[in-house]
Design a protein with these regions (language model features):
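Feature representing long, continuous alpha-helical segments
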Residues: 37-48, 60, 64-67, 104
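Structural helix-adjacent loops and short alpha-helical linkers that scaffold large soluble proteins
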Residues: 50-64, 111-119
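Extended glycan-interaction surfaces of carbohydrate-active proteins
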Residues: 1-38, 67-119
């Protein structure tokens, strides 16, 4: 329930404090950031652990995770990956429109996919 096509949610949708949409005042957005938004930057460490545990059996899931981002390249910041996404579908992009952390995480997942394809 934490893993989405746009990153890892910061809180479960089942939790009473969950905020699935990043909107409103600065306080509302800050609450959503830590209570439900999807952070792309967490995908790198998540996939690294999954590959270590499951090996090549995780390849399809890793591919599923990154495919959604390529669809998003022309949506929020042309040719860039956003900092965060709504926790609720359709996971609209928010925050920095060209996030180095998000880009690094996706590059790490691509690297891991290639590494485990070769093994």
């Amino acid at each position: 329930e934490l893993v989405t096509r746009r990153g890892i949610r910061t809180l479960s949708p089942r939790h009473s404090e969950y905020k699935g949409v990043y909107e409103g005042s600065q306080t509302d957005r800050d609450l959503a950031y830590y209570n439900g938004c999807c952070l792309t930057s967490l995908l790198g460490p998540y996939c690294e652990v999954c590959f270590k545990m499951k090996g090549a059996a995780f390849l399809n899931k890793a591919q599923w995770l990154v495919n959604g981002f390529y669809e998003d390249l022309n949506k929020h910041g042309v040719g860039a990956f956003s900092e965060l996404y709504d926790g609720d579908p359709p996971h609209e992009p928010h925050g920095a429109i060209s996030s180095a952390l998000s880009t690094a995480a996706l590059l790490e997942v691509e690297y891991l996919k290639n590494k485990y394809k070769e093994e």
